Protein backbone atom coordinates (compact mmCIF):
# COMPACT_ATOMS: atom_id res chain seq x y z
CA UNK A 1 0.00 0.00 0.00
CA UNK A 2 1.48 3.32 -1.04
CA UNK A 3 2.32 5.84 1.69
CA UNK A 4 0.61 8.79 0.02
CA UNK A 5 2.08 11.45 2.26
CA UNK A 6 5.63 10.22 1.67
CA UNK A 7 5.00 9.77 -2.04
CA UNK A 8 3.70 13.30 -2.54
CA UNK A 9 6.54 14.71 -0.49
CA UNK A 10 9.10 12.98 -2.69
CA UNK A 11 7.28 13.97 -5.88
CA UNK A 12 6.94 17.58 -4.80
CA UNK A 13 10.66 17.61 -4.09
CA UNK A 14 11.30 16.98 -7.77
CA UNK A 15 9.53 20.22 -8.66
CA UNK A 16 12.65 22.13 -7.66
CA UNK A 17 14.50 20.59 -10.59
CA UNK A 18 11.83 21.77 -13.00
CA UNK A 19 11.97 25.30 -11.60
CA UNK A 20 15.73 25.68 -11.30
CA UNK A 21 16.43 24.36 -14.76
CA UNK A 22 14.23 26.82 -16.61
CA UNK A 23 16.80 29.60 -16.65
CA UNK A 24 19.50 27.20 -17.77
CA UNK A 25 17.41 26.23 -20.75
CA UNK A 26 17.45 29.83 -21.90
CA UNK A 27 21.07 30.42 -21.03
CA UNK A 28 20.50 33.60 -19.06
CA UNK A 29 18.22 33.89 -16.05
CA UNK A 30 17.35 37.55 -16.57
CA UNK A 31 16.57 37.22 -20.28
CA UNK A 32 14.38 34.20 -19.65
CA UNK A 33 11.81 36.46 -18.01
CA UNK A 34 10.96 38.71 -20.94
CA UNK A 35 10.62 38.79 -24.72
CA UNK A 36 9.60 41.34 -27.35
CA UNK A 37 6.02 41.35 -26.03
CA UNK A 38 6.99 42.07 -22.43
CA UNK A 39 7.44 40.22 -19.17
CA UNK A 40 6.89 36.47 -19.09
CA UNK A 41 5.28 34.41 -16.41
CA UNK A 42 7.80 32.16 -14.65
CA UNK A 43 9.09 29.46 -16.96
CA UNK A 44 9.77 25.81 -16.26
CA UNK A 45 11.96 23.20 -17.92
CA UNK A 46 10.03 21.18 -20.50
CA UNK A 47 11.50 17.73 -20.05
CA UNK A 48 14.31 16.68 -22.37
CA UNK A 49 13.40 19.21 -25.06
CA UNK A 50 15.67 21.89 -23.65
CA UNK A 51 12.78 24.36 -23.85
CA UNK A 52 11.60 26.61 -21.06
CA UNK A 53 7.82 27.09 -21.18
CA UNK A 54 5.54 29.38 -19.22
CA UNK A 55 3.97 27.68 -16.23
CA UNK A 56 0.48 28.54 -17.50
CA UNK A 57 -1.01 27.60 -20.89
CA UNK A 58 -4.24 28.63 -22.62
CA UNK A 59 -6.76 25.85 -23.25
CA UNK A 60 -7.89 25.87 -26.87
CA UNK A 61 -11.30 24.26 -26.44
CA UNK A 62 -12.51 27.33 -24.57
CA UNK A 63 -11.02 29.69 -27.16
CA UNK A 64 -13.08 27.92 -29.79
CA UNK A 65 -16.22 27.90 -27.67
CA UNK A 66 -16.47 31.61 -26.84
CA UNK A 67 -17.47 34.30 -29.33
CA UNK A 68 -14.70 35.71 -31.49
CA UNK A 69 -14.47 39.08 -29.77
CA UNK A 70 -14.08 37.47 -26.34
CA UNK A 71 -11.61 34.96 -27.76
CA UNK A 72 -9.44 37.76 -29.12
CA UNK A 73 -9.63 39.59 -25.80
CA UNK A 74 -8.69 36.40 -23.93
CA UNK A 75 -5.72 35.73 -26.20
CA UNK A 76 -4.45 39.30 -25.83
CA UNK A 77 -4.96 39.13 -22.06
CA UNK A 78 -2.91 35.93 -21.94
CA UNK A 79 -0.08 37.42 -23.98
CA UNK A 80 -0.04 40.66 -21.99
CA UNK A 81 0.03 38.59 -18.81
CA UNK A 82 3.10 36.67 -19.92
CA UNK A 83 1.56 33.40 -21.17
CA UNK A 84 3.30 31.92 -24.21
CA UNK A 85 1.95 28.34 -24.41
CA UNK A 86 -1.23 27.71 -26.43
CA UNK A 87 -3.15 24.43 -26.58
CA UNK A 88 -5.67 23.29 -29.17
CA UNK A 89 -6.77 20.15 -31.06
CA UNK A 90 -8.24 19.24 -34.43
CA UNK A 91 -11.26 17.83 -32.63
CA UNK A 92 -12.17 21.03 -30.80
CA UNK A 93 -15.22 22.51 -32.52
CA UNK A 94 -14.37 20.35 -35.56
CA UNK A 95 -11.27 22.42 -36.19
CA UNK A 96 -12.88 25.69 -35.15
CA UNK A 97 -10.48 26.25 -32.27
CA UNK A 98 -7.48 25.80 -34.57
CA UNK A 99 -8.98 28.15 -37.15
CA UNK A 100 -9.53 30.78 -34.50
CA UNK A 101 -5.93 30.61 -33.32
CA UNK A 102 -4.85 30.65 -36.95
CA UNK A 103 -6.69 33.94 -37.36
CA UNK A 104 -6.23 35.70 -34.02
CA UNK A 105 -2.88 34.41 -32.70
CA UNK A 106 -0.56 33.02 -35.35
CA UNK A 107 -0.32 35.89 -37.87
CA UNK A 108 1.06 38.34 -35.30
CA UNK A 109 2.62 36.07 -32.69
CA UNK A 110 3.72 32.75 -34.22
CA UNK A 111 7.39 33.20 -33.37
CA UNK A 112 6.57 34.30 -29.84
CA UNK A 113 4.49 31.33 -28.70
CA UNK A 114 4.75 27.59 -28.13
CA UNK A 115 1.95 26.13 -30.26
CA UNK A 116 0.52 22.67 -29.60
CA UNK A 117 -2.29 20.71 -31.20
CA UNK A 118 -3.53 17.12 -31.05
CA UNK A 119 -4.93 14.34 -33.25
CA UNK A 120 -7.58 11.71 -32.50
CA UNK A 121 -6.46 9.71 -35.56
CA UNK A 122 -7.05 5.96 -35.53
CA UNK A 123 -4.75 5.07 -38.46
CA UNK A 124 -1.94 6.33 -40.68
CA UNK A 125 -4.05 8.03 -43.33
CA UNK A 126 -6.21 9.83 -40.81
CA UNK A 127 -3.14 11.00 -38.88
CA UNK A 128 -1.60 12.59 -41.98
CA UNK A 129 -4.96 14.11 -42.90
CA UNK A 130 -5.32 15.60 -39.43
CA UNK A 131 -1.78 16.98 -39.45
CA UNK A 132 -2.14 18.74 -42.79
CA UNK A 133 -5.55 20.06 -41.77
CA UNK A 134 -4.20 21.37 -38.47
CA UNK A 135 -1.30 23.14 -40.15
CA UNK A 136 -3.66 24.74 -42.65
CA UNK A 137 -6.20 25.88 -40.06
CA UNK A 138 -3.48 27.17 -37.74
CA UNK A 139 -1.94 29.11 -40.62
CA UNK A 140 1.56 27.75 -40.00
CA UNK A 141 4.04 25.35 -41.58
CA UNK A 142 5.20 23.82 -38.31
CA UNK A 143 4.01 22.90 -34.85
CA UNK A 144 5.97 23.10 -31.65
CA UNK A 145 4.18 20.05 -30.24
CA UNK A 146 1.85 17.51 -31.87
CA UNK A 147 0.17 15.01 -29.58
CA UNK A 148 -1.79 11.77 -29.80
CA UNK A 149 -5.11 12.91 -28.35
CA UNK A 150 -7.04 11.23 -25.55
CA UNK A 151 -5.73 7.69 -25.23
CA UNK A 152 -8.51 5.88 -23.36
CA UNK A 153 -7.24 2.45 -22.30
CA UNK A 154 -4.49 -0.08 -23.14
CA UNK A 155 -6.48 -1.55 -26.04
CA UNK A 156 -6.90 1.91 -27.55
CA UNK A 157 -3.14 2.47 -27.30
CA UNK A 158 -2.37 -0.88 -28.92
CA UNK A 159 -4.77 -0.16 -31.79
CA UNK A 160 -3.22 3.21 -32.56
CA UNK A 161 0.27 1.70 -32.52
CA UNK A 162 -0.73 -1.21 -34.76
CA UNK A 163 -2.47 1.14 -37.20
CA UNK A 164 0.63 3.31 -37.59
CA UNK A 165 -0.36 6.47 -35.73
CA UNK A 166 2.79 6.52 -33.62
CA UNK A 167 4.91 6.00 -36.76
CA UNK A 168 3.33 9.09 -38.31
CA UNK A 169 4.22 11.07 -35.19
CA UNK A 170 7.86 10.04 -35.56
CA UNK A 171 7.94 10.92 -39.27
CA UNK A 172 6.26 14.27 -38.67
CA UNK A 173 9.01 15.14 -36.21
CA UNK A 174 11.78 13.88 -38.49
CA UNK A 175 10.48 15.95 -41.42
CA UNK A 176 10.14 19.14 -39.40
CA UNK A 177 6.37 19.43 -39.41
CA UNK A 178 6.53 19.38 -35.63
CA UNK A 179 9.43 19.99 -33.29
CA UNK A 180 8.21 17.65 -30.55
CA UNK A 181 5.63 14.91 -30.09
CA UNK A 182 3.55 13.77 -27.13
CA UNK A 183 0.40 12.00 -25.97
CA UNK A 184 -2.60 12.96 -23.85
CA UNK A 185 -5.52 11.46 -21.98
CA UNK A 186 -7.77 11.79 -18.97
CA UNK A 187 -9.84 8.57 -18.93
CA UNK A 188 -7.45 6.15 -17.27
CA UNK A 189 -3.83 6.18 -16.07
CA UNK A 190 -3.55 2.62 -17.38
CA UNK A 191 -3.63 3.99 -20.93
CA UNK A 192 -0.67 6.23 -20.18
CA UNK A 193 1.16 3.37 -18.52
CA UNK A 194 0.63 1.30 -21.66
CA UNK A 195 2.17 3.99 -23.84
CA UNK A 196 5.18 4.17 -21.55
CA UNK A 197 5.52 0.38 -21.57
CA UNK A 198 5.47 0.27 -25.37
CA UNK A 199 7.68 3.19 -26.38
CA UNK A 200 9.93 6.04 -25.36
CA UNK A 201 9.45 8.21 -28.45
CA UNK A 202 7.49 11.00 -26.80
CA UNK A 203 8.83 14.32 -25.55
CA UNK A 204 5.70 15.33 -23.63
CA UNK A 205 2.64 13.96 -21.88
CA UNK A 206 -0.58 15.76 -20.97
CA UNK A 207 -2.67 14.33 -18.15
CA UNK A 208 -5.24 15.09 -15.48
CA UNK A 209 -3.76 16.49 -12.26
CA UNK A 210 -5.87 17.77 -9.38
CA UNK A 211 -6.66 17.31 -5.69
CA UNK A 212 -9.26 14.59 -6.30
CA UNK A 213 -7.07 12.62 -8.70
CA UNK A 214 -4.82 11.47 -5.91
CA UNK A 215 -7.61 9.42 -4.31
CA UNK A 216 -8.98 7.58 -7.38
CA UNK A 217 -7.24 5.98 -10.38
CA UNK A 218 -4.48 8.51 -9.94
CA UNK A 219 -2.46 9.88 -12.84
CA UNK A 220 -0.27 11.66 -10.32
CA UNK A 221 0.65 8.44 -8.53
CA UNK A 222 0.73 6.01 -11.46
CA UNK A 223 2.16 8.08 -14.32
CA UNK A 224 4.01 11.22 -13.21
CA UNK A 225 6.94 9.41 -11.53
CA UNK A 226 7.76 7.59 -14.78
CA UNK A 227 7.52 10.81 -16.76
CA UNK A 228 9.95 12.49 -14.39
CA UNK A 229 12.30 9.50 -14.49
CA UNK A 230 12.37 9.58 -18.31
CA UNK A 231 12.63 13.37 -18.47
CA UNK A 232 9.36 13.72 -20.39
CA UNK A 233 7.72 17.14 -20.20
CA UNK A 234 4.63 17.06 -17.96
CA UNK A 235 1.60 19.08 -19.07
CA UNK A 236 -1.07 19.26 -16.39
CA UNK A 237 -4.76 19.74 -17.12
CA UNK A 238 -8.10 19.61 -15.32
CA UNK A 239 -6.84 21.28 -12.16
CA UNK A 240 -10.51 22.04 -11.44
CA UNK A 241 -11.73 18.69 -12.82
CA UNK A 242 -12.93 20.35 -16.03
CA UNK A 243 -15.52 22.25 -14.03
CA UNK A 244 -16.40 19.27 -11.86
CA UNK A 245 -15.12 21.12 -8.79
CA UNK A 246 -17.89 23.69 -9.23
CA UNK A 247 -20.71 21.17 -8.81
CA UNK A 248 -24.07 21.38 -10.56
CA UNK A 249 -25.35 19.25 -13.42
CA UNK A 250 -23.47 20.83 -16.30
CA UNK A 251 -21.92 17.56 -17.41
CA UNK A 252 -25.14 15.59 -17.58
CA UNK A 253 -23.64 12.25 -16.66
CA UNK A 254 -24.14 11.69 -12.96
CA UNK A 255 -26.82 14.15 -11.88
CA UNK A 256 -26.04 16.76 -9.23
CA UNK A 257 -22.34 16.99 -8.43
CA UNK A 258 -20.98 18.03 -5.03
CA UNK A 259 -19.33 21.44 -5.01
CA UNK A 260 -15.62 21.47 -4.16
CA UNK A 261 -14.95 25.13 -5.06
CA UNK A 262 -15.48 27.27 -3.06
CA UNK A 263 -17.09 25.10 -0.38
CA UNK A 264 -13.93 23.18 0.49
CA UNK A 265 -10.98 24.69 -1.39
CA UNK A 266 -10.31 27.87 -3.33
CA UNK A 267 -9.39 28.09 -7.00
CA UNK A 268 -5.98 29.34 -5.96
CA UNK A 269 -5.40 26.33 -3.69
CA UNK A 270 -6.49 23.90 -6.40
CA UNK A 271 -4.15 25.42 -8.96
CA UNK A 272 -1.23 25.86 -6.56
CA UNK A 273 -1.48 22.17 -5.68
CA UNK A 274 -0.73 21.21 -9.28
CA UNK A 275 2.09 23.72 -9.65
CA UNK A 276 3.64 22.29 -6.48
CA UNK A 277 4.21 19.04 -8.40
CA UNK A 278 6.82 18.50 -11.16
CA UNK A 279 4.66 19.89 -13.95
CA UNK A 280 6.14 22.03 -16.73
CA UNK A 281 2.94 23.87 -17.56
CA UNK A 282 -0.73 23.78 -16.60
CA UNK A 283 -3.39 24.15 -19.29
CA UNK A 284 -6.28 26.28 -18.08
CA UNK A 285 -9.59 26.66 -19.86
CA UNK A 286 -10.88 30.21 -19.30
CA UNK A 287 -14.48 31.01 -20.22
CA UNK A 288 -13.54 34.65 -20.74
CA UNK A 289 -10.71 37.16 -20.44
CA UNK A 290 -11.45 37.84 -16.77
CA UNK A 291 -10.95 34.18 -15.89
CA UNK A 292 -7.72 34.21 -17.88
CA UNK A 293 -6.51 37.16 -15.84
CA UNK A 294 -7.48 35.40 -12.61
CA UNK A 295 -5.19 32.45 -13.45
CA UNK A 296 -2.40 34.79 -14.51
CA UNK A 297 -2.59 36.57 -11.16
CA UNK A 298 -2.41 33.25 -9.32
CA UNK A 299 0.65 32.29 -11.36
CA UNK A 300 2.40 35.58 -10.68
CA UNK A 301 1.88 35.13 -6.94
CA UNK A 302 2.59 31.41 -6.84
CA UNK A 303 4.33 29.97 -3.81
CA UNK A 304 4.95 26.28 -3.25
CA UNK A 305 2.94 24.21 -0.81
CA UNK A 306 4.27 22.73 2.39
CA UNK A 307 3.66 19.01 2.89
CA UNK A 308 1.02 19.58 5.58
CA UNK A 309 -0.94 22.05 3.46
CA UNK A 310 -0.92 19.68 0.51
CA UNK A 311 -2.14 16.76 2.60
CA UNK A 312 -4.90 18.77 4.29
CA UNK A 313 -6.29 19.85 0.93
CA UNK A 314 -6.31 16.28 -0.36
CA UNK A 315 -8.19 15.16 2.74
CA UNK A 316 -10.80 17.90 2.24
CA UNK A 317 -11.92 16.36 -1.07
CA UNK A 318 -11.00 12.71 -0.51
CA UNK A 319 -14.62 11.66 0.00
CA UNK A 320 -15.49 13.12 -3.43
CA UNK A 321 -12.99 11.00 -5.32
CA UNK A 322 -14.37 9.00 -8.23
CA UNK A 323 -16.29 9.60 -11.42
CA UNK A 324 -18.85 12.06 -10.08
CA UNK A 325 -16.47 14.99 -9.70
CA UNK A 326 -13.87 13.61 -12.13
CA UNK A 327 -16.65 12.67 -14.54
CA UNK A 328 -14.23 12.10 -17.46
CA UNK A 329 -12.49 9.13 -15.86
CA UNK A 330 -13.45 5.69 -17.11
Regions inferred by a protein language model and the residue ranges of each:
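N-terminal secretory signal peptides and thylakoid transit peptides that target proteins
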Residues: 1-15
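Structured C-terminal cap/extension of enzyme domains
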Residues: 14, 198, 222-330
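C-terminal segment of N-terminal export signals and the immediately downstream linker at the start
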Residues: 23-56, 64, 73
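Conserved, mostly hydrophobic/aromatic
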Residues: 46, 58, 86, 101, ...
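Acidic (Asp/Glu)-rich catalytic clusters
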Residues: 47-50, 102-110, 135-140, 196-199
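Active-site mouth loops of central-metabolism enzymes
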Residues: 59-69, 118-125, 254-262
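Glycine-rich, proline-tolerant flexible connector loops at the mouths of alpha/beta enzymes
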Residues: 88-104, 153
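Glycine/proline-rich, positively charged
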Residues: 122-218, 222, 228-235, 290
